[in-house]
């Protein structure tokens, strides 16, 4: 039996050695008319792609285990809030629907709703089974009994990304969602720092996106990525440009397009079906590249069979997963940008074997863009919310452990013990405590829609995704950050 108060449990936000399948439970417990009443919310229900490493075959994804919340009415699950549209925060919902579960109302941005509807269609989820979706925007306030949720815009690599302020009994939590501090975003709202400043004294806890906390400085701004593209194209003086982008990070579609437009390059989009699905989503959202061009350049939604239609100077924006020999014609006049670290080495080798000049994220880290706060972003936020207890999420456990010493040196009041999946904390106004620690559980969604329960286990080096983080490289980055901090302080 839980005492009255606000409780928080990460169900999928901190994998042992990889990140994915994010899901966080907030539960407020109160007494009403001599009865104990629970009100629970979830923030995000993502999927974990490296399901093979969990030891289950014939599968399509792994998802955090929320079955107890869905089956037990006493838990009072009222809603699921969605920070944004990326698969590791959103796609778990579809696998629960495929397995026959009924979900509560969903709250998310309009872009997230469009992506989700596309997923429903792909998995053939019947209309009557699809949960109610309430579109939210920056500044909205929703109440569930005495639990208050305020919506704050967040700058990320997709549209309509949000963080949330959750308040209950004089306890306020800022759940950041994936975000960075960037007010140069194209067609998107920046992180609502103004509102955070207004309520900073009331914020007791920050559940933060520490995905890239091992990067020093401020997260890359979209305007700087745009300028970098332009400068590199001008420097190498190539007339045929190929820009690889990560399919779900639509900000890069737009940044690459605007750079090509600025320099007068005709543009063709080319990729696999996943890439074109996101192009369709952009259209539904209202982003039309032909309209953006205003007849200044030619725009092709798909690569034409006859490349001569593109003219003498053109840029192809596409995914690294769809390449063919059309790109290698007159290779000496081609410049390829590899903006995704994933599989960049193989792609770069293909290009170099054909005599193509390649610039990758290893050469120019700025090219990959960023949707996550760096160390500098969090130091700025710490100055604003200087009374809060900071709770790192969205990163492997070893990153948390390596960050702990650096975080204390930087003045962060970090939660102790650090959060692992399925640990339950009680958040009080002046203190917190670890209430419960259980083994983390995942459900592996199989091809027939059924789900198999399995315990979390170390996954690095196993399955389809061998490594998402380098422990050695992470430690080196933290050592550099720590050295610079100590030097600045004269230690």
What are these regions (language model features)?
Residues 24-26, 164-166, 424-425, 432-434, ...:
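Short beta-strand element of the conserved SAM-dependent methyltransferase core
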